[in-house]
């Protein structure tokens, strides 16, 4: 079971770097967001920490995929291949059916995590795009105010 832990944030207004640290299942996942030089006029703690947290969550999902689900699926497939090569292999046995079920279930888990990673990446991209559009409008209004 995943124990929810409050993320730890760090914001450095001098450098424009935000960091988010998430500890889950004994592993540390870090997300970093660095403000681009051309956006320093719009730099903010909330935006930086939000982006850093989204990146830390992505790191967590990738670790689940790469460190847990993929090795488990590979082990199940290797086991099935090994028993399939045996002279005593019985495709109708309870154990064979359970192993095939575990392979299917783990493959479905892998597909789910891949989908979650894709959705999280899209959410991050959308968030950053919306922020860029907002900043563009604010800059435009500031320019208009200066000329008036």
Region roles according to the model:
Residues 93-148:
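C-terminal charged interaction modules
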Residues 9-49, 59:
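Positively charged, aromatic-enriched nucleic acid-contacting surfaces
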Residues 61-105, 109-112, 116:
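Intrinsically disordered, low-complexity charged/polar segments
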Residues 5-7:
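A generic, well-ordered mixed alpha/beta core segment in the N-terminal half of proteins
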